[in-house]
């Protein structure tokens, strides 16, 4: 049964048991039991830890003894959860039953660990003894750190945070603050990038996560952020919500993360906690402005895996208040959506494969023959009348399939199978519109969500069949309680030209052609022409070759306008064009010319 202290909103059981079923309740016996868990069998280890924690939380124990035993369990729970993550991270957004159960098991393990530390807090809270201040601080810090695990995992899975979790985090910090132990140093062996964390620093980690717009981030970036917040939490402090610098405030009576101060009435500020993120944002922006060679000397503490894209996102999320440019309108109807650069390129190109997009689009003039001319060899033994010759048929190709619109292909035609295969590779989805604005849409996934869907992914949108495809990006994803999965789509451009893009290198061989999209300039809003490229290998200053329907021209990529984990968008300027012989089509690298021609082709560019 759960007990809620009259002065505390911490959910804990009332211990009633005198013994453990699996060993004696001594540090020596618990240590031996933990050391002999079947670590090679992760499932069995998790089961025994789960049952062991439940029993431990029902056991009547003095505070010091409980803390000793929990400290032995803590690294084992951390080990199991870290190794179980591969079963549910980097999967489809909506998990199948097995990975969902594994994720729930990790949540339960860390929740039961947190319950153990909350029992210490509840037992110690009435004593108010200075001699036991350090023990009280350790109990609160460990409870906050244990609750942080389910919060990070919910963010990574785009799920709602467990009910009551934010309330308990706020309550734990307030208890520490009231006793004056919130800034006591607490050693923490599980902290990866600092020897210890005070209660205030431990509390700042979930607060900063809560206002970092994690639903716009990818799972690996959320994990890196949670790590780097350990050293970053030392750069900030909790202050009064009434101070001018408090951009975000947390209201302890509200079960939710910090929000912009301007969203709360003045009457709620008196009891609220404020966060001034400006010192951290200034360090991030200072790092971003430094030349690459000098970033190692920057004042901002960093860890491996924190990318420039992540820093730019955090600079925006923790910077000045973001205001919605357009008002949302409740939507109705559906949109057709495709996911990823390859699919969008394919549909923009009229369902043509990439190698065809790179060829010169010509309608060869059909040769004219006189039917009444007598062939001197017509009577030869091996002469056979050609009945299936097609005008403009390339003589070096064995088979030629004229391009036809998918609508014109009969179901029994051999090409119907090829087009069916291509469509299976690039599926489309009809999604209901939740709401919309001139800047984008909120769409709902009523059924299974494809594994490819991630925040920052490029998508194509089509209003009606046969209409042009618009270019957009997935800005955020969330799972709604009893409401499936929703995502926010931001429009990039109403149209684009599919093309091939090749990175030109001076000292090595140039890259193969990769899919890219050309977006025209819009003079009315002073927007220059841009190109959307894959995330790698292109960067600012890269010299590239653009292949548009077989016509090649060179360009230089200038300022990067946008970047996600899937694509980059660059401004570009034309460089010296490369003239393509009109009698020789340009094809993708997979379509190899004869050996002699290939050797000469590589020679022309090096002369």
UniProtKB/Swiss-Prot annotation:
Residues 568-582 have a biased composition (Polar residues). It is found in: Cytoplasm. Keywords: c-di-GMP, Cytoplasm, Nucleotide-binding, Virulence. Disruption phenotype: Mutant has reduced surface piliation and is unable to increase piliation upon surface exposure. It shows defects in initial surface attachment and in early biofilm formation, but late biofilm formation is not affected. Mutant loses walking motility but twitching motility is barely affected. GO terms for cellular component: cytoplasm. A motif (RXXXR motif) lies at residues 324-328. Changing residue 440 to A: Cannot bind c-di-GMP. Residues 568-607 are annotated as: Disordered. A motif (D/NXSXXG motif) lies at residues 435-440. GO terms for molecular function: nucleotide binding. Residues 323-492 are annotated as: PilZ-like domain. The keyword GTP-binding does not apply. Monomer in the absence of c-di-GMP. Forms dimers in the presence of c-di-GMP. High-affinity cyclic-di-GMP binding protein that regulates type IV pili (T4P) elongation. Required for T4P-mediated surface attachment and walking motility during the early phases of surface colonization. Not required for twitching motility. Does not bind related nucleotides such as GMP, GDP, GTP or ATP. Contains a PilZ-like fold that binds two molecules of c-di-GMP via two well-conserved c-di-GMP-binding motifs, RXXXR and D/NXSXXG. This is Cyclic-di-GMP receptor FimW. It comes from Pseudomonas aeruginosa (strain ATCC 15692 / DSM 22644 / CIP 104116 / JCM 14847 / LMG 12228 / 1C / PRS 101 / PAO1). The gene is fimW.
């Amino acid at each position: 049964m759960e007990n809620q202290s009259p002065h505390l909103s911490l959910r804990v059981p009332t211990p009633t048991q005198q013994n453990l079923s699996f060993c004696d309740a001594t540090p020596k016996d618990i240590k031996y039991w933990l050391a002999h868990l079947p670590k090679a069998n992760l499932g069995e280890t998790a089961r025994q830890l789960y049952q062991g924690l439940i029993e431990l939380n029902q056991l009547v124990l003095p505070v010091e003894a409980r803390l000793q035993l929990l400290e032995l369990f803590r690294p084992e729970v951390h080990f199991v959860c870290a190794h179980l993550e591969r079963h549910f991270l980097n999967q489809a957004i909506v998990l199948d039953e097995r990975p969902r159960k594994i994720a729930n098991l990790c949540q339960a393990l860390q929740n039961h660990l947190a319950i153990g530390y909350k029992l210490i807090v509840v037992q110690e809270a009435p004593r108010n003894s200075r001699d036991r201040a350090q023990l009280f601080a350790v109990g609160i810090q460990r409870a906050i750190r244990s609750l942080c695990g389910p919060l990070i995992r919910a963010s990574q899975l785009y799920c709602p945070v467990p009910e009551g979790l934010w309330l308990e985090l706020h309550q734990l910090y307030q208890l520490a603050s009231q006793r004056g132990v919130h800034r006591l140093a607490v050693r923490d062996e599980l902290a990866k990038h600092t020897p210890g964390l005070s209660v205030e620093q431990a509390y700042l980690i979930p607060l900063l996560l809560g206002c970092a717009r994690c639903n716009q981030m990818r799972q690996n970036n959320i994990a890196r952020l949670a790590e780097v917040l350990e050293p970053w939490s030392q750069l900030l402090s909790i202050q009064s919500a009434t101070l001018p610098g408090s951009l975000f405030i947390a209201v302890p009576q509200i079960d939710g993360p910090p929000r912009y101060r301007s969203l709360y009435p003045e009457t709620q500020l008196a009891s609220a906690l404020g966060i001034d993120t400006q010192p951290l944002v200034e360090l991030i922006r200072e790092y971003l402005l430094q030349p690459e060679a000098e970033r190692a000397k920057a004042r901002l503490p960093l860890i491996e895996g924190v990318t420039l894209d992540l820093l730019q996102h955090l600079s925006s999320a923790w910077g000045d208040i973001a205001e919605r440019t357009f008002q949302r309108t409740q939507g109705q109807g559906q949109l057709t959506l495709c996911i990823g650069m390859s699919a969008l390129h394919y549909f923009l190109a009229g369902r043509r494969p990439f190698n065809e997009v790179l060829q010169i689009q010509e309608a060869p003039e059909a040769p004219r023959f006189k039917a009444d001319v007598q062939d001197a060899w017509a009577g030869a033994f091996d002469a056979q009348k050609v009945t299936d010759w097609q005008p403009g048929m390339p003589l070096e190709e064995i088979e030629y399939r004229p391009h036809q619109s998918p609508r014109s292909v009969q179901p029994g035609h051999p090409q119907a199978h090829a087009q069916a295969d291509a469509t299976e590779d690039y599926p489309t989805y009809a999604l209901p519109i939740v709401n919309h604005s001139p800047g984008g849409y909120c769409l709902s996934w009523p059924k299974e969500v494809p594994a490819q869907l991630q925040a920052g992914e490029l998508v194509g949108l089509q209003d009606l069949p046969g209409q042009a495809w618009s270019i957009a990006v997935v800005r955020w994803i969330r799972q709604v309680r009893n409401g499936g999965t929703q995502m926010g789509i931001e429009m990039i451009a109403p149209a684009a030209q599919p093309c091939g893009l090749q990175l030109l290198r001076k000292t090595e061989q140039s890259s193969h052609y990769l899919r890219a999209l050309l977006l025209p300039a819009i003079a009315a809003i002073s927007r220059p022409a841009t190109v959307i490229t894959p995330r790698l290998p292109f960067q600012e200053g890269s010299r590239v070759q653009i292949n548009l329907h077989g016509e090649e021209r060179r360009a230089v990529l200038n300022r990067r306008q946008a970047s996600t984990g899937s694509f980059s968008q660059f401004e570009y300027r034309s460089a010296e064009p490369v003239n393509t012989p009109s009698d020789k089509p340009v094809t993708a690298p997979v379509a190899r010319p004869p050996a002699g021609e290939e050797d000469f082709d590589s020679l022309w560019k090096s002369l």
